[in-house]
Regions:
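Generic structural signal for residues positioned in beta-strands
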Residues: 11-12, 95-96, 114, 149-150
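Amphipathic alpha-helical interface segments
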Residues: 27-51
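...with weaker cross-activation on analogous glycine-rich loops/strands in unrelated enzymes
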Residues: 42-122
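Eukaryotic N-terminal accessory cofactor-binding modules
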Residues: 37-40, 58, 154-156
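Surface-exposed patches in mature extracellular/periplasmic domains of secreted proteins
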Residues: 21-31, 83-89
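Active-site nucleophilic cysteine motif
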Residues: 2-21, 25, 62-67, 104
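Residues that form generic nucleotide/phosphate-binding pockets
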Residues: 12, 16, 37, 72-77
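Active-site or metal-binding loop neighborhoods of secreted/extracellular toxin and effector enzymes
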Residues: 114-159
Length: 159
């Protein structure tokens, strides 16, 4: 039996059942990776200070940070691919949505035509219909307000 305290929304949605984090490197290495991956101007001192502050604070509000996190997510999760909507899902895939807030991110799973999620150490729950508004592009629940990043996750091979 899985201990639900050992995984968060990312571990649940990606079905790794581990605690998921975006920032996995030392701060200075993470900042360097962001500038290299996104080909940002290293001489833009304002941008550099903003990115350093975001990484050191664990923030995600800067669009460059969000883009970097999505790129890293796709690199770390080979069974994941970006999609525009859930009509693109294949038979062996389920949907994953990701949004960012100021200092947090949240994943939602779309499987068998139902949305579900897991908050921190709480148990996963199916989302009520009225909560589906979070998944609308203009929806803003005051916590997660970024663009919605949608993905198709290929189910694990059962050998």
């Amino acid at each position: 039996m899985m201990n639900i305290e050992y995984f968060n929304c990312g571990g649940y949605a990606l079905e790794t059942y581990e605690w998921f984090e975006f920032y996995t490197k030392e701060d200075n290495e993470e900042v360097k990776s962001i500038f290299e991956e996104l080909k940002l101007n290293k001489n833009d001192e304002g941008l550099r200070e903003r990115i350093i502050y975001q990484v050191e604070s664990g923030y995600f509000s800067d669009i460059n940070i969000q883009k970097y996190c999505v790129i890293e997510l796709l690199k770390r999760t080979p069974r994941l691919r970006p999609i525009l909507n859930y009509h693109e899902l294949r038979k062996n895939e389920y949907g994953v949505a990701l949004r960012f807030g100021e200092d947090d991110f949240h994943f939602v799973k779309y499987k068998n035509h139902k949305f579900s999620h897991k908050r921190g150490e709480l148990k996963p729950i199916e989302l009520p219909d009225e909560y589906k508004g979070w998944l609308g592009e203009r929806a803003n629940d005051q916590r997660y307000y970024s663009k919605i990043y949608r993905f198709a996750m290929r189910t694990a091979d059962k050998n």
